[in-house]
Amino acid sequence: AIAGCVPINLTGGVGTLTPEMLGFSTFVAHDEYGYKMQQYFANISGDIVELPGGMMSFAAGLEHRVESGFDSPDALINSGNTTGNARTATEGQYSLNEAYLELAVPLLKDVFLAESLELSLATRYSDYSNFGSTTNNKIGFKWKPIDTLLVRGNWSEGFRAPSINELYQGVSDSYPQVTDPCSTTVYNTLNADQKAVCTSQGVQVGGYEQSNPQILTQVGGSLTLTPETSESSTLGFVWSPTQNFDISLDWWKIDIENTITAYGAQFIMDQCVVEGVDNFCTLFSRGPGGEIDSLLSTNL
């Protein structure tokens, strides 16, 4: 027994609960959380030289940034000794140094097939304490062959480092509803290869009766994450036949690699059993009867 605990008599009737009994039936959670960012920067901009299309200008700068954050749940919540979902602590930080340069280059103006022609150039160097350095560039143009038509385009590189939460988030419990493809509800719709996946995981032929669709799922950050990188291109035009009427048409393409996302529990199960992606099969475990014990959904 817990020292000082006064048991509740659930059959005692109305008015029999004392403050001493209630003192051990509920608690007031004391969570602490915080986020801090320190940022130092210096910027400069101005004109450089006169070109046929106008004045060439620039902008440049340096930046230093430190970000940190934490989430400290109540000790009872952290231990899982409550009727609510457990949650462990989150804490982490990183620092970043950056330098950038931008140029606006007006090449032509008021000449044949060039009412205006402008070029924009930009580059940014970033050095992360936890991911190393990267340089990302951008180039764009605006061209007005005639007064009523604007043609524009851009090409750029992108980089996004994982956030503190995506990296260091503590594990928390949730209970989403999941339909197991290996249960009797779905089993007969599977093909031979999919059924073989179920069998390899200890599920009996024919599937099992899934009595509880709410599966313990642990969600958290991942220190194995790598930065997202991207490359984007756009091309379009704006036609302005009258002063108050514009028609625009734009084409764009964005390629993203190493996308950071947290997959849902159902998606993980389907990818493993239905799609046959082995990596997802390592994110959950089964009991002796084939039922799902628990599932892990971290940022990937």
Model regions and ranges:
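Surface-exposed, low-complexity loop segments enriched in small/polar and acidic residues
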Residues: A1-L96, F112, S156, R160-P227, ...
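Surface-exposed extracellular loop regions of Gram-negative outer-membrane beta-barrel proteins
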Residues: F58-S72, Q93-I146, S230-S232
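Membrane-embedded beta-strand positions in outer-membrane beta-barrel channels/transporters
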Residues: Q39-S45, Y100-E102, A122, K138, ...
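Outer-membrane beta-barrel strand-turn architecture
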Residues: I48-P52, L107-L113, W143-D147, T229, ...
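Amphipathic repeat-derived elements
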Residues: L22-D31, E118-R124, S129-G140, L216-S240
